[in-house]
């Protein structure tokens, strides 16, 4: 299995919303613009190196585990009540058969759509999520919402600020395990961590075997067909151009894993906006546009010079659920990657 040509170093967008950019905290991790409809990672952390021995062998009671940010967290073993504050975490939690443990999930403020701004309609239905489970994570974090859910453990990504994490742990006394993979292999690591927390290592190993097999299949496909068609992958558009993924993002890494080359893959801006003239000059063989949350082909057709892009003219514009491009979770590998392999290497 080959490593992706670009190992993501910046967190993929993590929170779907259409909010003014003035609310966003770290500009390098957001889509710069007045308002966009994608997921956004709000916060970055200086991850401390784990010191000494942290991880213990759990069997009951509390145990220590090192999370993705290098934090040594003392967590309850197999907690019955868990708050999951990220769609990318809810995905493996569900796949591992842990839905019954989930008592709360992340939501945006009611005025901006609540649950439906963080989760797609398919996710809400599949995972049986309800508005009553909402913990508001934006534009401000509601400690009260979380307290009312009475979880024993919080699993969160970097849509949660360090201040909020500190408040959860010090004010409420609830441990927080941060799951924010930095690479594709980190997705498998998080599956293993979740398996350890809930005492279901066998199920985690089985899921990781599926993920490994899919990555191996992608590697074999690239060997059998070494062509690397150029691609514009976009998740939103406005009058100025097409929002896309630069270097160090999961969106770019997924394109590379599928045996193609993003026309913006070397851009130092993780989430640049490409003007129409740049897209036309690059002449990508394919266009992959993110769908869901109100985005569809008709929406992108309103973009500058959309109908003049040769890939669009030749019928090589393909819609793909935005979750597959932005959420670092098993579904990105199990569903998104095979779809792209079929598109680029039929």
Predicted regions and their residues:
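Bacterial Sec-exported substrate-binding components of ABC uptake systems
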Residues: 2, 6, 11-92, 201-234, ...
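Short helix-initiation/N-cap motifs at beta->coil->alpha
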Residues: 58, 68-70, 127-143, 182, ...
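Short helices/loops that flank or line small-molecule/ion binding pockets
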Residues: 77, 140-151, 171, 273-283
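A short, structured surface patch at a secondary-structure boundary
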Residues: 81-149, 153-159, 260-263
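Short, structured coil segments at secondary-structure junctions
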Residues: 98, 171-172, 258, 312-313
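Extracytoplasmic ligand-binding site segments that recognize negatively charged/polar headgroups
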Residues: 110-115, 161-165, 177-193, 228-253
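Structured C-terminal subdomain patch of bacterial secreted/periplasmic proteins
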Residues: 185-199, 205-209, 219, 288-346
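Alpha-helical, coiled-coil/dimerization segments enriched in small aliphatic residues
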Residues: 243-271
């Amino acid at each position: 299995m080959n490593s992706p040509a670009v190992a993501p170093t910046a967190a993929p967008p993590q929170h779907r919303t259409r909010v003014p950019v003035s609310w966003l905290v770290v500009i390098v991790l957001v889509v710069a613009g007045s308002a966009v409809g994608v997921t956004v990672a709000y916060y970055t952390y200086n991850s401390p190196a784990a010191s000494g021995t942290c991880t213990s062998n759990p069997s009951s009671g509390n145990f220590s585990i090192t999370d993705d940010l290098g934090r040594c967290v003392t967590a309850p073993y197999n907690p019955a009540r868990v708050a999951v504050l990220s769609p990318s975490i809810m995905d493996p939690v569900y796949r591992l058969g842990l839905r019954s443990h989930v008592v709360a999930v992340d939501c945006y403020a009611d005025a901006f759509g609540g649950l439906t701004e963080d989760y797609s309609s398919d996710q809400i239905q599949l995972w049986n999520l309800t508005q009553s489970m909402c913990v508001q994570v934006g534009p401000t974090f509601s400690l009260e919402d979380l307290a009312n859910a009475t979880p024993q453990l919080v699993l969160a990504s970097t849509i949660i600020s360090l201040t909020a994490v500190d408040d959860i742990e010090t004010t409420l006394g609830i441990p927080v395990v941060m799951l924010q993979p930095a690479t594709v292999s980190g997705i498998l690591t998080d599956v293993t961590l979740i398996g350890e927390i809930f005492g279901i290592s066998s199920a985690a190993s089985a899921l990781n075997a599926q993920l490994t097999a899919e990555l191996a299949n992608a590697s074999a496909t690239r060997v059998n067909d070494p062509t690397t068609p150029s691609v514009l992958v976009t998740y939103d558009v406005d009058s100025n151009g097409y929002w896309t993924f630069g270097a160090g993002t999961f969106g770019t890494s997924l394109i590379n894993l599928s045996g193609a080359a993003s026309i913006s893959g070397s851009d130092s801006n993780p989430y640049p906006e490409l003007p129409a003239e740049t897209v036309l000059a690059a002449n990508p063989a394919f266009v992959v546009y993110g769908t869901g949350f109100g985005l569809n082909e008709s929406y992108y057709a309103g973009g500058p010079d959309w109908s003049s892009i040769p890939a669009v003219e030749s019928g090589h514009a393909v819609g793909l659920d935005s979750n597959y491009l932005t959420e670092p979770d098993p579904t990105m590998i199990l569903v998104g990657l095979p779809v792209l392999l079929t598109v680029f290497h039929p």
